[in-house]
Amino acid sequence: MELTPEQKKWSSKRRQDVSATCLRSILIEQKGKCALSGVDLLFDVAEGTPKAGGRGCHPLYPAVDHIDPGNPHGGHQIVCYALNDLKGHLPFDCFEALKVTAAWKSLMAKWREQSMKDRADRESF
């Protein structure tokens, strides 16, 4: 997979202590998709830079996720900003249990559906 100019720009600097080289490798491995939902990530910098008093990051903007938080060797993945936020607010064991439920699978199917329908509609995610 060849990275788009937007993906190259996003992955050109270290994030969450992950090197640019590693970020590019993860992006290629994930084919530019969220590791949790399978949705194409939105690499538009304007959508990922919150403005004071304005809207925050777009739910589909990429975020570096520690697969196993607290484990320095737990690895990284790139996920949707909103899903990374959700994961960060739950205990790790709880999130892992949630991922295998029918409700989670249904939610991820709806995310993929909405992403194909109208990814610009932030409130639908």
Give the label of every model feature segment.
Residues 1-43, 71-75, 86, 92-113, ...:
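Contiguous alpha-helical segments
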Residues 36-79, 87:
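Histidine-centered nuclease catalytic patch
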